[in-house]
Amino acid sequence: MKKIIFAVLILVLIFVCYWFISPLFIDKKVSEDLPVVETVNEETVSSETTQTEPVSQTLEIKVGTFTGFDRLHTGSGTAKVISIDGKNYLRFEEDFSVTNGPDLYVGLGENGEYIKGSELEKLKGNMGSQNYELPEGTNPEDVKEVWVWCRAFSVPFAKAILY
């Protein structure tokens, strides 16, 4: 019985160590285009005639550059707040890079402080271009800082102050 308990504990320990340590060695590159709006040709409406076209009304509202917090939690690249046909997004450009880690989320901050509960979405990847829709009712002018935050340990990885 002791051998079974010991084996189970070893397996759990291996899994936990892998979950904590593997992100430091594994990069996930994302390459998202700007969001698109779906349009439907009303003359020939059918389930097969839906077309997607790139949106022409893109407005850049704010921009900032990511910085890390220490040697273990580094970040770089461009963050933007953009508006496309009335919807507001955070856009991480192609040059975005952050140290990978467990349970990373994109959130908001103000005056150098992370706003708890402001998570927009789980970080899609630690490198490359990606989009995150701001919640409806959020004034894009009020977005001051974008944070990459480790929710499991309440640790900041990177932030961008937006101007």
Where do the PLM segments sit?
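Short proline/glycine- and polar residue-rich coil/turn motifs
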Residues: 122-128
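Transition segment at domain starts
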Residues: 21-85
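Exposed aromatic-hydrophobic patches
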Residues: 91-94, 129-137
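Hydrophobic membrane-insertion alpha-helices, especially the h-region
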Residues: 5-19
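A short beta-turn/strand-edge loop motif at beta-sheet boundaries
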Residues: 96-100
